[in-house]
Amino acid sequence: MEGKRLRDSYRQQSYVVRIFHPRGQYPRIKIMQPNALFWADDEVVFSVIHSVPWRVHDEDAPYTEMDWLAPDEIQFLGSIFLSERRNDARIRFYPVYGYGPRIAQKTLDLSKQSVAERIRDSIWIRLAHAPWGNHGKELNECRTHRYSLLDPKLLNLDRQPMYWAGVSTRDYVMLRGISSLFKADMLSSYYEFFEEAIVSAFIALEASFRLIVRKLEGEGIRNAGARDAAQWLFKHFDEPMGLPRPTIERYFEEFYDQRVMTLHPASRFGDNPYAPVSHDDYYHLRSSLREIFAYLAAGSHGPDFHEDVQRLGRR
């Protein structure tokens, strides 16, 4: 798709192709649904999603010059991402930034094997003739570098449809939280940007807190706050594991001071010349928040959570 048709496609619903870079880590799967496709094999990883641009999805959405994933893309890719198991293999989406060609078709059934294979072959040919422009180097690497693919048995992919249904494209806080974890994973690919990965995880932490507060208020708790969110977290995650009630009183209280000092060079904690963070902060937040978002989306824990409860109960 080129010229005016391409420009028009950015202002309406269309089939958006995303190529994923070998810097990421992906499940070796083919998820084919009528309006969404994810394909990962040894040679290429890509998605095709019948997607609506943000400004079409919501004309009141704030202006941004950042070319990032559309709401339908975050919803679909998020449903795969949330399918991770506790303390197991980690998915790391790494889309080629700013590159999202459109398919010149009004309607496609992406659940058909023949359609998916035809798209896959077209992408492979396109990668072979990638221009050396803004994306040429990365697209060439997608063809020449080796992908890191995960055994799908390490994931709860049978829950992917449940997560897809549970993440609404109108739930901007959930979308922001999930996409912030995507960004945190991308940044963590570079040692020098690990601090920024933690900052992105802090954004996801704030999103999870707001989602829990809204859930509690929807259940009748007036003016729910950090203490209520901490009790909710203990009740749904720690107590079933037989863990003692924590001494901290606020939601993820152990990160509160760090977050303030990281985001505010001067605060009531004094002047901070650098962020007081560690690599473990990222790994802890990444694991915990993914599981919290998954629970909020599905309304239940995955089988791996119950396996851990039983295992701890037998000790």
Residues covered by each model-derived region:
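General structural signal for alpha-helix termini and helix-helix connectors
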Residues: 186-190, 214, 264-268
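Charge-enriched, short contiguous segments at helix-coil
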Residues: 139, 245-310
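Short, solvent-exposed loop/turn segments at secondary-structure junctions
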Residues: 99, 206, 268-269
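Charged, non-catalytic interaction/linker regions at domain boundaries
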Residues: 1-199, 203, 283, 287-315
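Generic detector of ordered secondary-structure context
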Residues: 176, 196, 216, 251-254, ...
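Flexible secondary-structure boundary motifs
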Residues: 199-250
